[in-house]
Amino acid sequence: MLKGYLETLLDVTPEEQTRLHRALSQMNQQSLRMEALVHDLLLLSRLESTQADDVQQAVLVHGMLNRMREDAISISADKHHQIELDVPKEARVIGHPAELDSAFSNLITNAVKYTPENGVIKIRWWQDEKGAHLSVADNGLGIDPRHIPRLTERFYRPDNSRVTQTGGTGLGLAIVKHVLLRHNGSLEIQSALGKGSTFTCHFPPERLVSKPTAVAG
């Protein structure tokens, strides 16, 4: 309700009431952050407290990641990022489409947030004898390696604070971690200050598609 009122008040002509418009804009941004925080808290609570649904599908990874790349290009238009996608069109993984969508989009959105102008973001998917892997790499701010073990904790903020510099709920990587756990997978983080970061999702061989099944994507 509050968000609706604020959006209505924002229709006031800025030239007429500049100070009011500025204050309402700030209030609207705060309401959006609160809305995002509540959404992420509810999602994380569900991931932590419920068992994975037995109904799983063969998710079309290329289609999902290509859509996210297009969204990222739109979001980062003013930063002129180079966003590369290296994903085989036949790539599929058995899982929960909505959960995987949340995990992958969190990683790509983070890369957009923490990569400076004209930076490069690389999204790559590959398979080997160990399973399937998705990496999202950037040449952005980077993180001091001593913080890496705690990055998937709720609300954890490194000293150089990628989060405080760019906003965010502080729950994104916790969500990624729990989605991967529900898919028998894991998250690997490599980073160095000033050199960027690489976040890699690892899925075991049993998550690869080996026979016909329902497809989502």
Model-derived features with residue positions:
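Short acidic helix/loop segment immediately C-terminal to the autophosphorylated histidine
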Residues: 10-17
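Short alpha-helical segment of the dimerization/phosphotransfer core of two-component systems
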Residues: 26-34
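Conserved catalytic submotifs in the C-terminal HATPase_c
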Residues: 55-58, 82-92
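Short helix N-cap motif at coil->helix boundaries in the Bergerat
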Residues: 61, 142-153
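Short beta-strand/loop element within the Bergerat-fold HATPase_c
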Residues: 118-130
